[in-house]
């Protein structure tokens, strides 16, 4: 993906999660998206069927409270190399298929080479907690908004 996919990402996030469009657009601009490692899945007709948006933003940007609650934990996590999953959206008719797996596996060699873990913040109301837990992600912190997972790679 490239920065040219910013509006596409915002549209998908608004449609999928019901977030405010202006807020999502500011996230896309301000949260250090790693466009080269983000994945856009296309079907055989070149329609977008999935987005995996990776970001270089720091854990404390997602959950500033961790600095007060767990200063040693955040210090140890920030001593490692990590990347964040900002959003992972798959079209309704592709859920339950291999698409999620294939999208993540398409970047896994580079992730394993350049990072120690993947930071995965998941809003409490979303259904992807079990998905990441099945991958082996471990909860390391939670706040009022989300649960933070760490997936060692």
Q: Predicted segments — roles?
A:
Residues 1-10:
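A short beta-loop-alpha structural element at the N-terminal edge
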Residues 29-40, 44, 50, 55-62, ...:
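A short helix-loop-beta-strand connector motif used in the catalytic cores of GNAT acetyltransferases and
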Residues 85, 96-104:
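Glycine-rich acyl-CoA binding loop
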Residues 49-50, 141:
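A structural microfeature
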Residues 53-87:
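Conserved acyl-donor/pantetheine-binding loop and adjacent beta-alpha core of acyl/acetyltransferases
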Residues 82-83, 111-124:
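Conserved GNAT acetyl-CoA-binding A-motif
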Residues 90-95, 107, 119-133, 143-148:
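Conserved beta-strand-loop-alpha-helix junction that forms the acyl-donor binding cleft
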Residues 10-24:
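Helix-loop element at the rim of GNAT/NAT acetyltransferase active sites that forms part
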């Amino acid at each position: 993906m490239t920065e040219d996919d910013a509006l596409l990402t915002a549209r998908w996030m608004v449609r999928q999660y019901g977030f405010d469009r202006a807020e999502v657009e500011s996230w896309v601009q301000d949260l250090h998206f790693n466009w080269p490692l983000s994945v856009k899945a296309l079907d055989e007709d070149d329609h977008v069927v999935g987005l995996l948006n990776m970001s270089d933003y720091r854990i404390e940007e997602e959950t500033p409270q961790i600095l007060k609650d767990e200063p040693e934990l955040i210090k140890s996590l920030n001593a490692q190399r990590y990347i964040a999953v900002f959003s992972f959206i798959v079209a309704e008719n592709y859920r339950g298929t291999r698409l999620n797996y294939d999208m993540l596996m398409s970047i896994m060699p580079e992730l394993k080479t350049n990072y120690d873990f993947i930071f995965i913040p998941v809003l409490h109301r979303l259904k992807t907690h079990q998905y990441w837990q099945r991958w082996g992600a471990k909860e390391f912190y939670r706040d009022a908004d989300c649960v933070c997972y760490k997936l060692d790679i």
